[in-house]
Amino acid sequence: MATIQTEGLTYRYGIGTPFEKTAVDHVDLEIEAGSFVGIIGHTGSGKSTLIQHLNGLLRPTEGKVLLDGVDIWADKLKMRQMRFRVGLVFQYPEYQIFEETVAKDIAFGPRNMGLAEEEVQARVQETAAIVGLSKEILKQSPFLLSGGQKRRVAIAGVMAMRPEVLILDEPTAGLDPRGREEILQEIQAYRNQTGATILLVSHSMEDVARHAKRILVMNAGKVFCYDTVANVFRRSQELQAIGLAVPQITRVCDALRARGVPLTDDIFTVEQAKQQLLEWYHRTRGGQGTC
């Protein structure tokens, strides 16, 4: 069942001025409940504008956004409750922290939901554990933490509201490879624990390939394609034509396959490549030796 749908979603900036521009152009989309969707596209493709419609930060110029089949703009009185159900983490969310302790910052959202203090504290502890923040860190000022820890605090603040849909705009931007993978694993842990739907905007084809089950490709404000990871990345020439690329390991394996190495055309992660190369090595070596 689709948890989020868009019907003819269109958004224009600067209507009636010489600077009028269509940022999202008649987008029809269905996001299944519990899915992990990667959203990719070159700069200016409409990714960020699209996701800001999904929790009502922007109102469509035309079309609808539906949450569980209900138009989110049908009743403005219910908009606040809807935003608790659809959480949005902006790029560089650590710039939005403001409380005097980490615990208070994470608790801000749940308190605004009107929850009992006991429930608020339970959510703080639970979410801190998901993102790897210790009890000692909860007592500290968030402004004294490292960049990666601040990022975790900000993400935890949204997770603590337990949104059914969690949308993240480049949550790993500016982090080193280890920090990037840790953040993505924590997002995956939240999904595993809550069954939430995850929408991840990313410029990293590798991150999307490792974690997403489906990929939405945006181009010039329109849906270029929306399909499984394998089906999207098999369209490498079409992706390159719109300024995107397949994961680097896929390009390496394509080159090896062109030179006679018997690899399949659905390798999109280093782990997949390693498995197939090891199998090929052992076949050619008769099962002898190690790699």
Can you say where each PLM-predicted feature lies in the sequence?
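ABC ATPase NBD Q-loop/coupling interface
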Residues: 15, 64-81
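Catalytic Walker B motif of ABC-type/P-loop ATPase nucleotide-binding domains
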Residues: 166-169
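Conserved ABC ATPase "signature" C-loop
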Residues: 220-221
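Helix-to-loop junction immediately C-terminal to a conserved catalytic motif
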Residues: 55
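Conserved ABC ATPase "signature" region
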Residues: 118-136
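Conserved catalytic motifs of ABC-family nucleotide-binding domains
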Residues: 162
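Conserved ABC ATPase signature
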Residues: 141-145, 149
